[in-house]
């Protein structure tokens, strides 16, 4: 059986935590920022975890 390959797009966007959960950056932080408040932009800087429903599918993209 051939080796499983890591999905490179997912690998660049996600990191595995020590407990095996997936960490991701928040969306809406790239452009059109003038109409967003400073508080909103500050909160968008924080990272968050991938939801449990999505994590199962995404884990298949990152086998290693």
From Swiss-Prot:
Which branch of life, at top level?
Answer: Bacteria
Q: Does the keyword Ribonucleoprotein apply?
A: yes
Q: Which GO terms describe its molecular function?
A: structural constituent of ribosome
Protein keywords: Ribonucleoprotein, Ribosomal protein
Q: Where do the record's region annotations for Disordered lie?
A: 1-25
GO CC, any one term: cytosolic large ribosomal subunit
UniProt xrefs under Pfam families: Ribosomal_L35p (PF01632)
An example GO BP is: translation
Among Gene3D superfamilies, the record links this protein to: 4.10.410.60
User: Which family, according to UniProt?
Assistant: Belongs to the bacterial ribosomal protein bL35 family.
Q: Which PANTHER family match?
A: 54S RIBOSOMAL PROTEIN BL35M (PTHR33343), LARGE RIBOSOMAL SUBUNIT PROTEIN BL35M (PTHR33343:SF1)
Name of the protein described by the UniProt record? Large ribosomal subunit protein bL35
- Organism, per UniProt? Clostridioides difficile (strain 630)
């Amino acid at each position: 059986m051939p080796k499983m390959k890591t999905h490179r797009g997912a690998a660049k966007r996600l990191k595995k935590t020590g407990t095996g959960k997936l960490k991701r950056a928040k969306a809406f932080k790239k452009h059109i920022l003038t109409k967003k408040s400073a508080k909103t932009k500050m909160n968008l800087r924080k990272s968050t975890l991938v939801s449990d429903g999505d994590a199962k599918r995404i884990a298949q993209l990152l086998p290693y």
